[in-house]
Regions:
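Glycine-centered tight turns that cap/initiate beta-strands
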Residues: 76, 147, 313-316, 363, ...
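PLP-dependent enzyme catalytic core of the Aspartate aminotransferase-like
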Residues: 119, 128, 146, 293, ...
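Active-site beta-loop-alpha junctions enriched in small/polar residues
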Residues: 156, 185-187, 322, 348, ...
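Short hydrophobic/aromatic beta-strand micro-patches
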Residues: 222, 344-346, 406-408
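Conserved small-domain helix->loop->beta segment predominantly found in fold-type I
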Residues: 271-274, 278-280, 285-289, 294-296, ...
Length: 429
């Protein structure tokens, strides 16, 4: 279906015809743990990767398979692997690339959970991270050492929606024989497809825009199929015979889909962060309206940014659509149709004023999720990024007066009226 447009692909990929078992037009929920093999040789072929298909529910499921194929198509990849959460997708990606003694080069301004994973959790297993200012290309390249295994970015940083120069950083990574990993959770494939800009692996928290309704946890890893694992010489676990899977070379057995096949066959098999069939089904429902929702998110965001930028109680709006934002040129290059409906602003005052503003909103829900059809708000310094010390917070331009907004799809007049009510409460009105 590669000739179809995005809006058609999001509805049909993975189930081009009615379900063969039931004639169902909707993708069924295959609620099963295991699958019957036709005979012993069929079972052996499945386990040996000679025959593609279901083996066990921890590894594959037919509902999950449709979801994986659909997101892979939307991102322009060759294959995908769904996981139980976005955190699992990111963790598996790094674990597949780096082992004890290895290092990752990562953008400083990323989601707090990802920062904590790289800075603290993975160091317990001997994997370190060198955090860099992604806007300083010389700093990015100088951070690459012989033990570096990947470069890690976000298309839109969390929470400030800062934008790296993906094309330039991809060129640096590939010059050194390294894959570029990009978290496209905030960008979405409707607004930007990182593989077209040189990304080798794309990850998502599907909980966010893909699901879109705040109901379902899930993650997904998309393999571009473009990275040559053998030529790199740095990834023996993928390119060489793997003793934990009876000597299979995943590069040989799975070809362009080697990366996600390795994760499925080894990491998912051994640690089991499997997406449930029901969650895969719900995420498919979200995928089918992705383009429609994103258009409304973007439309509303433009108007909210304009409102905040001209408000006397706002110290600063951190949104790349503004001409004075340092990433404005990159925003116009990579997001010609708009984006960044999750962003921050600094209210005049400090923590007290930020809390007062947040606590007096009615439509905006105070919670730790983003990218919901409902508008959301949070104070990052005391919640999502509270594990960072003061220096780390300052490096990410998160202060006690910083407020993160996730703009939903409500009527724009109601959104702006709610924000104004928050400001009025701060004024004591």
């Amino acid at each position: 279906m590669s000739n179809y447009k995005f809006e058609t692909l999001q509805l049909h990929v993975g189930q081009e015809q009615a379900d063969p078992a039931t004639d169902s037009r909707a993708v069924p929920i295959y609620q099963t743990t295991s699958y019957v093999f036709r005979n012993s040789q069929h079972a052996a072929d499945r386990f040996g990767l000679a025959d593609a298909g279901n083996i066990y529910g921890r590894l594959t499921n037919s509902t999950q398979d449709v979801f994986e194929k659909r997101i892979a198509a939307l991102e322009g990849g060759v294959a995908a692997l769904a996981t139980a959460s976005g955190a699992a997708a990111i963790t598996y990606t790094i674990e597949a690339l780096a082992q004890a003694g290895d290092d990752i080069v990562a953008q400083k301004t990323i989601y707090g959970g990802s920062y904590n994973l790289l800075e603290h959790t993975l160091t317990q297993f001997g994997v370190t991270t060198t955090f860099v200012n992604a806007h300083d290309l010389a700093e990015v390249e100088n951070a690459i050492q012989p033990n570096t295994k990947a470069v890690y970015l976000e298309t839109l940083g969390n929470p400030n929606s800062d934008i790296p120069d993906i094309d330039a950083i991809a060129a640096i990574a590939h010059k050194h024989g390294l894959p570029l990993v990009i978290d496209n959770t905030f960008g979405t494939p409707y607004l930007i497809r990182p593989i077209e800009h040189g990304a080798d692996i794309v990850v998502h928290s599907a909980t966010k825009f893909i699901g879109g309704h705040g109901t379902t946890l899930g993650g997904i890893i998309v393999d571009s199929g473009k990275f040559d694992w053998k030529a790199s010489g740095k990834f023996g676990n993928i390119a060489d015979p793997n003793p934990s899977y009876h000597g299979v070379s995943f590069a040989d057995a799975a070809g362009p889909a080697a990366f996600v096949t390795y994760i499925r066959a080894i990491l998912l098999r051994d640690t089991g962060a499997t997406i449930s069939p029901f969650n895969a089904f719900l995420l498919l429902q979200g995928t089918e309206t992705l383009s429609l929702r994103i258009e409304r998110h973007v439309e509303n965001t433009k108007k909210v940014v304009e409102f905040l930028a001209n408000h006397p109680q706002v110290e600063k709006v951190n949104h790349p659509s503004l001409p004075d934002h340092p990433d404005h040129a990159l925003y116009e290059k990579y997001f010609p149709n708009g984006g960044a409906s999750i962003f921050t602003f600094n209210i005049k005052g400090g923590r007290k004023e930020a809390f007062k503003f947040i606590d007096n909103l009615k439509i905006f829900s105070l919670l730790a999720n983003v990218a919901d059809v409902k508008s959301l708000v949070i104070h990052p310094a005391s919640t999502t990024h509270s594990q960072l010390n003061d220096e780390e917070l300052a490096e990410q331009q998160i202060y006690q007066n910083t407020i993160r907004l996730s703009i939903g799809t409500e009527h724009i007049d109601d959104i702006i009226a709610d924000l104004e009510a928050g400001f009025a409460a701060v004024r004591g009105e």
